[in-house]
Amino acid sequence: MTTINVEVRNDQGKGASRRLRAANKFPAIVYGGSEAAISIALDHDTTKNLELKPGFYDSVLTLVIDGKETKVKVQAVQRHAFKPKLTHIDFVRV
């Protein structure tokens, strides 16, 4: 099982997302279950390397959010139109 350390994101919107991407990170969201949705930020290079491995899209991943482990699956991925960059990922709780 794959474990990914993430950080909670407080700033939202286009400007905040652009600043994240300039810092080699990108926004994501975790939703589903009985808990509220959480906006998070992921390291781009680490996530891109994990994405290339088989099973990234169909296996259960573990996100460490503020020291708490959350089991999720990838729901949707958004990519840059012509660069090999991830721009956003939706995770759904399992």
Swiss-Prot record:
GO terms for biological process: translation. GO terms for molecular function: 5S rRNA binding; structural constituent of ribosome. InterPro entries: Rbsml_bL25/Gln-tRNA_synth_N, Ribosomal_bL25/Gln-tRNA_synth, Ribosomal_bL25_short, Ribosomal_L25_dom, Ribosomal_uL5_bac-type. CDD domains: Ribosomal_L25_TL5_CTC (cd00495). SUPFAM superfamilies: Ribosomal protein L25-like. Keywords: Ribonucleoprotein, Ribosomal protein, RNA-binding, rRNA-binding. One of its GO terms (cellular component) is cytosolic large ribosomal subunit. PANTHER family: RIBOSOMAL PROTEIN L25/GLN-TRNA SYNTHETASE, ANTI-CODON-BINDING DOMAIN-CONTAINING PROTEIN (PTHR33284), RIBOSOMAL PROTEIN L25_GLN-TRNA SYNTHETASE, ANTI-CODON-BINDING DOMAIN-CONTAINING PROTEIN (PTHR33284:SF1). This is one of the proteins that binds to the 5S RNA in the ribosome where it forms part of the central protuberance. This is Large ribosomal subunit protein bL25. It comes from Yersinia pestis. The gene is rplY.
